[in-house]
Regions:
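Active-site acidic catalytic loop and adjacent metal/ATP-binding pocket
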Residues: 1-14
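Active-site activation/catalytic loop segments of kinase-like enzymes and analogous catalytic loops
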Residues: 13-57, 73-92
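Intrinsically disordered, low-complexity coil segments
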Residues: 55-62, 134-137
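All-alpha amphipathic helical-bundle segments outside canonical DNA-binding/catalytic cores
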Residues: 59-71
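Transmembrane helix-bundle signature of multi-pass membrane transporters/permeases
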Residues: 8, 70-74
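General structural signal for secondary-structure boundaries
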Residues: 40, 60-61, 119
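ATP/Mg2+ or Mg2+-diphosphate-binding catalytic cores
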Residues: 77-137
């Protein structure tokens, strides 16, 4: 299975933001318990450390500046897409049950809140990683 969003040209921010969004919520995207939704900063650090060890050589200072913002934006954007689809009768995203897209939206909104609560730490993390030399320079 290939997600065609990953093979077309686009902003690197969307790719890393979506990667972190999908990986750093231990409860997963389909959880029914919103209280279980969280943002795993340690996993985020591991992902960004690995990513920047390679990509740090071609990302600009502005690219790095906006990484935390995209990590916060992508779950909000996806939540809005799920909510819109729910309101339009579930015509875009495949659903297993009534209210499925609404639940997905709520999970993404809760994840956005969790990222927001740790946003200063996320900015500090990116700033710290930015100072580390990239082995690929």
């Amino acid at each position: 299975l290939i997600d065609l969003d990953t093979v077309k040209p686009g902003l690197v921010h969307y790719d890393i933001g979506d990667c972190v969004r999908s990986c750093c919520n231990p409860a997963g995207e389909e959880t029914l318990c919103l209280d279980d939704v969280s943002f795993d900063m340690e996993l985020c650090e591991a992902i960004l450390t690995g990513y920047l060890s390679v990509a740090g050589g071609f990302l600009s200072d502005w690219d790095l500046h906006y990484l935390p913002h995209c990590i916060r934006l992508i779950p909000l954007e996806l939540g809005l897409r799920f909510l819109t689809d729910h309101l339009e009768g579930d015509v875009y995203f495949r659903c297993d049950r009534p209210g499925h897209n609404l639940q997905r939206a709520l999970v993404q909104f809760r994840l956005t809140e969790a990222v927001e609560q740790q946003f200063n730490a996320l900015e500090q993390l990116v700033a710290r990683l930015k100072q580390q030399p990239s082995p690929n320079l």
